[in-house]
Amino acid sequence: MDAVLAAARSGDTAALRSLLDPDAVLRADPGAARRGVRPAHGAPAVARALAARAATARPALVDGAPGLLAAPSAIYVFTAPAGPITSVDVLADPSHLSHRTIAVPA
C-alpha cells in the first residue's frame, strides 16, 4: 500500500498504472457512490480515480489484508491475487463496514 499511497499523493498516475492489472476495476458500494465515487474499468481509469480520491487515505489492514482507510468512513479493499492489483472496492455504506475488521498500523 505504500507504493499506492505514494503515487496517489503525488498524483503519479503512471506509477499507479504500473501497480494495476490492465483490466483492473474499481467498484463503489452505495455509500461510496453517494460520496461521488464512480466505478472505473481499466488501469488508466482506476489510476485516475485513485489519484483523485486516495491521496488523503492511510494504510490499514482490512480483515487482515492490506487496504486503505479514508476519512470520514470509507475503506479501499484491494485484490491482488498474484501480482498486480486486479480490483479495488470502495466501501462506505455502514452496512458494509460494520462487519469488517479495520486496523490502522501505528
Language model regions located:
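C-terminal and inter-domain tail/linker signature
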Residues: 1-106
